[in-house]
């Protein structure tokens, strides 16, 4: 058997426990995020106090926002995630790979041995450069492909560019999304509604269609859904619709592509501390108390979802398809 497919009983049990219980091998102390210093702990930690809790300072950025300007800065696994070679030699394309869950997945994939191409909105270049440097620091190939996912021609070009630069594709993560809070449906213009739909629904449709020409048995497609698909809030009318649609395209496409040996799964985050929230995704009042409604009483950090994206792409998850994996601090479904 190939090395990447071989796993001992002990390492399998240990690995599964680690994947399901935590987002990284070495956790981060909560106060580290406020000081931008990272302290590693090898012991157990209370998940309720592991990361910053509300109230948060008032802050606002133009859409789509930058990780580097958030306070506290999110943990995307820059210093907390340690890989074990689970994705050695794999080739991944991640949309929205500059920040949030996409950034966490990109860092984790590189540290698990994968080459990674990331897409991002052109104004996010500052964050994207950091991710590219982190990928290269692991000795992996890093490809930056900025562009607007509302453009069908660009989405096809994105896939072609990534496949050419990486010499193939094994993992496709449709993660990029637009989220803007509106008190009423009357406040949403047709242009804004179209922007959300094009980014969150059309783009994955175009990207997956283009990617199928490169995908072989054993590859993985992963979509980022949301707790909003199951428990939508009144102020995210358009965004919540797209996440319900994401959940259903994952389940439908998984059945369609299973005979081809292609797995399709999703991740459904709850309230996660990302640039999406500070750039119009939440009202200032909700932002100050962000995550307080969860049983854990705090928002999640992108790094806490990184291992889920790794697990769904790994060979030892070969029987998992059409599944939605939640990470929401105890609220919502699944």
Q: Model-predicted segments: where are they?
A:
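Alpha-helical segment proximal to the catalytic Tyr-Lys
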Residues: 213-214, 255-256, 318
């Amino acid at each position: 058997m190939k090395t990447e497919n071989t796993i001992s009983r002990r390492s399998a049990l240990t690995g599964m426990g680690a994947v399901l219980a935590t987002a990284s091998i070495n956790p981060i102390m909560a106060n580290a995020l406020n000081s931008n210093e990272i302290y590693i702990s090898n012991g157990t930690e209370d998940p309720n106090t592991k990361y910053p809790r509300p109230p948060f300072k008032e802050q606002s950025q133009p859409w789509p926002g930058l990780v580097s300007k958030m306070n506290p800065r999110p943990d995307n696994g820059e210093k907390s995630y340690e890989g074990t070679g689970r994705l050695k030699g794999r080739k991944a394309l991640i949309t929205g790979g500059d920040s949030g869950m996409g950034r966490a997945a990109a860092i984790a994939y590189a540290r698990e041995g994968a080459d990674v191409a990331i897409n991002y909105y052109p104004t996010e270049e500052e964050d994207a450069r950091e991710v590219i440097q982190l990928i290269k620091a692991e000795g992996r190939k890093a490809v930056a492909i900025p562009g607007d996912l509302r453009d069908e021609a660009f989405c096809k070009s994105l896939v072609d560019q990534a496949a050419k630069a990486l010499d193939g594709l094994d993992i496709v993560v449709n993660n990029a999304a637009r989220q803007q809070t509106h008190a009423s449906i009357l406040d949403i213009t047709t242009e804004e509604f179209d922007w959300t739909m094009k980014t969150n629904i059309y783009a994955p449709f175009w990207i997956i269609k283009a990617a199928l020409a490169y995908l072989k048995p054993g590859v993985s497609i992963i979509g980022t859904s949301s707790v909003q698909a199951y428990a939508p809030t009144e102020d995210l009318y358009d965004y919540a619709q797209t996440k319900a649609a994401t959940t259903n395209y994952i389940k439908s496409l998984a059945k369609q592509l299973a005979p081809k040996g292609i797995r399709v799964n999703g991740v459904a985050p709850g309230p996660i501390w990302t640039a999406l929230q500070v750039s119009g995704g939440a009202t200032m009042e909700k932002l100050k108390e962000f995550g307080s409604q969860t049983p854990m009483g705090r928002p999640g950090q992108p790094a806490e979802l990184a291992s889920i994206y790794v697990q769904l792409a790994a060979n030892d998850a070969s029987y998992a398809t059409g599944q939605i994996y939640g990470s929401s601090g105890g609220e919502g479904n699944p």
